[in-house]
Amino acid sequence: MFSQRYDPLAEENNGSRPADSGFGVSLKKRKLSDDESSDEEEEEEETDESEHESSQDEDINEEEPEEEDEDTNKVDDNMEIDSQPEVDPDYIHKHQAIFNKFKQSTESETIEQDKEEDGEEDANIEQHSLVPLPQPALPRDRKLSSVSTHTKNLDWLTKPQYASPSDKKAFTDFKSSSFMIKNLEKMGFTEAFSVQISVLNMMLPEIEAQKLKPDRVGDILVNASTGSGKTLAYSIPIIESLYRRVVPRVRVIILVPTKPLINQVKSTLLQLSSGTNLQIAALKNDVSINDEKDSLTKSVPDIIVSTPGRLVEHLLNDSINLSSLQYLIIDEADRLLNQSFQNWSNVLLDKIDSQINIAEVWKLSVQKLVFSATLTTDAGKLSSLKFYNPRLIIVNDSKQLVNEIFTVPVTLSEFKIHLGVAKNSLKPLILTKFLISTNKLSNVLIFTKSNESSIRLTELLTSLFQKLSINLKIAFINSTNNRTSIRSKILKQFSNQEVNILITTDLIARGIDVASITDVINYDLPNSSREYVHRVGRTARANQVGYAYSFCFGKGENSWFKKLAHEVSRSKEVENVDLNVKELISDRDEEIYQQALHELQQQAKK
């Protein structure tokens, strides 16, 4: 029933070679070592036992020959036959994560192969480079560009007329009255400067034409550097227009920012109107509002010079009748427009409109004349003046404007003195030695940042010059001694060189009109480009030569000065002055400086 099992050991002992093992596998006989023989015997015994158990499970009633399944048994070259292990569920569960990774790896390889196949197909497709589609210009971008441009100039208001600062013309070449030519010659003026030429050429023909027909003419805005002769530019035409008047009425109002300018403008008008019966009044805070009202009522002036605040007080008290007003002149307009002054522009213009009599057909409309060295481009500020057909005159070599129109005189030379911040403690001494070394010992105007610093610097410089055996007279003007009498006295002494060096602040800068000033020194830098222009504009007036020096200590002040200078239009670049402090100041100078400081401290304690 059972076939006899083949025993390799038996065959080996018998020395015979089996033809067939009965499993359909040809076995090769090889010589084994003792250890290999023992291992081989154990494996054969295990194989016999497993085959014996499997054979018992077969049906003994079957008569057919048994066929063994050879799939699970394999014989290697070493006569080893291994059975396939059974699948263990615990084993699969334990290594499930590894199986999952293997599965994902297999899937990803399949996807990559698919992509490569797709790529081969796409390679045959013609490819084109990506180019942006053409887009229409956005209206918003155009608007923003326009707004940015308008904030840098006044083209949005009117087309500017440029005039060269070097232009000159004899006053006799204008159609002026004989008395005007004589008065100008008495004042020492024979030639008109650029700003005066531009304004006179524009206004004198219109004044002559208005004698026959009262057509309304456009307003005028003038941007010219400080000291260019703006006061004469508007004073001459208004006197030419009024000197034939019969009945005195308020026909001209001139607004200025400070009381010193009131005196300056009134003095110019009185000299130009000499020989006429024109009445000129100045409204100041020196007297009460009621006293001024009585004076205006008893003697009605033709021309009023005032600050905006004082004028508004009189308008609210009905002290002034504006029904005959012909000219509204705003001098130093940038400062007046930057400060509200009781909302003066709205009050004044509303008062003018309310007193217009539309029944008077043969009547001249009010013409506005605006003058400034730093004319603003702010539409909000300029719109409050309600211009009619405005015309803009810019006296400047360059036609490239900045946000604010700042210009300095053409004849002005500017210099920058840059020193390290460590030298700041010797600042008064450096200034003193600089003035001595450059022989700038008269007609010098020095600007400081405050009243206290101006007084302190005056005391220090006076002491230092005395100790250095140099006899100079040094004075100061600030808001602490700005009474009309004191101010006029000091300015007269300064003009006559009885005072050699004058120290002041920004508050007083615009009221100083001394033609003899040759040098301006910015001991402390100004707070804005506008103030810088008005500071340095105290010299180089009326086409005379002038010099401006600015002290910069440290990188911070140097950067600030560069910003100020960048916003100013000029015909010449700012020059740098190399100042060697070690050569300029000796040990003896420092000892004198320390003594002067000690004396000043002792005076302050008293």
Curated annotation (Swiss-Prot):
Its main location: nucleus. GO terms for molecular function: ATP binding; ATP hydrolysis activity; RNA binding; RNA helicase activity. GO terms for biological process: maturation of 5.8S rRNA from tricistronic rRNA transcript (SSU-rRNA, 5.8S rRNA, LSU-rRNA); maturation of LSU-rRNA from tricistronic rRNA transcript (SSU-rRNA, 5.8S rRNA, LSU-rRNA). It comes from the Eukaryota. It catalyses: ATP + H2O = ADP + phosphate + H(+). Residues 35-71, 78-88, 109-124 have a biased composition (Acidic residues). A motif (Q motif) lies at residues 169-197. Residues 430-585 form the Helicase C-terminal domain. SMART domains: DEXDc (SM00487), HELICc (SM00490). One of its GO terms (cellular component) is nucleolus. The Q motif is unique to and characteristic of the DEAD box family of RNA helicases and controls ATP binding and hydrolysis. Associated with pre-ribosomal particles. This is ATP-dependent RNA helicase DBP6. It comes from Candida albicans (strain SC5314 / ATCC MYA-2876) (Yeast).
